[in-house]
Structures are given as C-alpha cells and as structure tokens.
UniProtKB/Swiss-Prot annotation:
Known partners and oligomeric status: Homodimer.
Family affiliation: Belongs to the 'GDSL' lipolytic enzyme family. IAH1 subfamily.
Domain of life: Eukaryota
One Pfam family here: Lipase_GDSL
Species this protein is from: Saccharomyces cerevisiae (strain ATCC 204508 / S288c) (Baker's yeast)
Function field: Plays a crucial role in the hydrolysis of isoamyl acetate in sake mash. Hydrolyzes short chain esters from acetate (C2) to hexanoate (C6), showing more specificity for shorter chain exters. No activity for decanoate (C10) esters.
Record field: pH dependence: Optimum pH is 7.5.
Residues of the active site: S12, D187, H190
Site (Transition state stabilizer): residue numbering on this chain: G53, N83
Catalytic EC class: hydrolase
Keyword tags: Hydrolase, Lipid degradation, Lipid metabolism
Name of the protein in its database record: Isoamyl acetate-hydrolyzing esterase
Catalytic activity: 3-methylbutyl acetate + H2O = 3-methylbutanol + acetate + H(+)
C-alpha cells in the first residue's frame, strides 16, 4: 500500500524527536515523533529527516536529494534556526541568507506539491547551555533568546509572504512555560518531553487551520475494521 507521507525536516531537535529518554539515566518522556506516528497510524507515514548540528545552508543541499528519492510526501515541517542564529562560528548563518535558504526550501517543496510548515526556534537557557560549552563561549559563539526572536520574527514574515503556516515556538514556550520555561529544555537548548508536547500541540493547531484534510481526525483510516473483514479476508481491499 502506498501511504502519503509527512516529512519532519530539520536539525537536532528533529533528529531527537523520537528519543523517549533525552536525559541520560532519566525517566521516559513524551516524544513528538512517536506521538505523531501513533496519531497518524493507518493514515499517513511520518518520515523523519533531522540532522544534528546542521544549518539552513547545509540543509538546503540535502532537501533536493530527499525529495528526489522519497515519493508521496504531502506535508512537511521546516525546522531550522537554532544553529543559524548562533552569534559566530561555523554554524552561524546571517539572517538574510537564512531567510533566503528557507524561502528556497519552501519553493522547492511547493514545486513537489508539498504543503510546508515553517517552525521558528524555541528558547535557550544560556546559563545551562553555556556550562557545557566553555570552548565555544571562549570563541564568542553565543545563542541568545534575543537573536532567536529576531530569526523567528523574520520566519513569521516569510511564512506570511509565502502563505504557509508558521509556528512561533519561542512565544508558545514563554506562554505555556511561564516562569518555569527552562523545564521545557534538557541541556538549555534541546527540548524535554514537556517542550516536545508544546511543539506537538502547536503543530497540530496549524495543521487543523491550514491543512485540515491532513489533521489526524479528518483522515480516513486505511483498510476495514477487523470486525468487518470476512473470515477468508476476501473483502479487505475492496
């Protein structure tokens, strides 16, 4: 059977989307990828393509190859920026180039009749993140919520221009996390189960608004209920 596909495309936060234990020796936590697979079971396949440490500059090289070799993708997230928005270093991508890269990805997806969803970067707990990144900090490689907001706002503008949905995760984290927003992160940058749950909920909201035909509740369950299958299975595919 040929299932339609939902592509999750991005950096480490996408790569870790199925990780139920984001904290070593910790308890199982909510996993975005597993939640989506569960909700879309017998409706649509979830195709995860996340690349730890990658930027929009590098991701732009990968996306054409993914789309060339994967068939029947109908919807996709583009979730990049947490690396691009770094103040300096090999992962830093200037804002104009970053936006142009994302624009090219959106255009490429549209050429394949894929419905894009742009995701903005979340938040960063500098105190926790920088404890483990002393060498990077010494070189002047910083991530800040102020810069994340600049990149997120630029993505929101791009999404509006391209008439595609946008998820402002930084604002959702601030609203849902309140004074305890740091709990939405594991190491100060990557998401905890609580962070992924907010991501999931915001994602499903925009799907319901912009692409309602691909919201899980509106998609048809593939094949008959087992109670309706004849003993010999002869009516399964009818």
């Amino acid at each position: 059977m040929d299932y339609e596909k939902f592509l999750l495309f991005g950096d480490s936060i996408t790569e870790f989307a199925f990780n139920t234990r984001p904290i070593e020796d910790g308890k199982d936590q909510y996993a975005l990828g597993a939640a989506l697979v569960n909700e879309y079971t017998r409706k649509m396949d979830i195709l995860q393509r996340g690349f730890k440490g990658y930027t929009s500059r590098w991701a732009l090289k990968i996306l054409p190859e993914i789309l060339k070799h994967e068939s029947n993708i109908v919807m996709a997230t583009i979730f990049l920026g947490a690396n691009d928005a770094c103040s300096a270093g090999p992962q830093s991508v200037p804002l104009p180039e970053f936006i142009d890269n994302i624009r090219q990805m959106v255009s490429l997806m549209k050429s394949y009749h894929i419905r894009p969803i742009i995701i903005g970067p979340g938040l960063v707990d500098r105190e926790k993140w920088e404890k483990e990144k002393s060498e990077e900090i010494a070189l002047g490689y910083f991530r800040t919520n102020e810069n994340f907001a600049i990149y997120s706002d630029a993505l929101a503008k791009l999404a509006n221009e391209e008439k595609v949905p946008f998820v402002a995760l930084n604002k959702a984290f601030q609203q849902e996390g309140g004074d305890a927003w740091q709990q939405l992160l594991t190491d100060g940058l990557h998401f905890s189960g609580k962070g992924y749950k907010i991501f999931h909920d915001e994602l499903l909201k925009v799907i319901e608004t912009f692409y309602p035909q691909y919201h899980p509740k509106n998609m048809q369950y593939k094949l008959k209920d087992w109670r309706d299958v004849l003993d010999d299975g002869s009516n399964i595919m009818s």
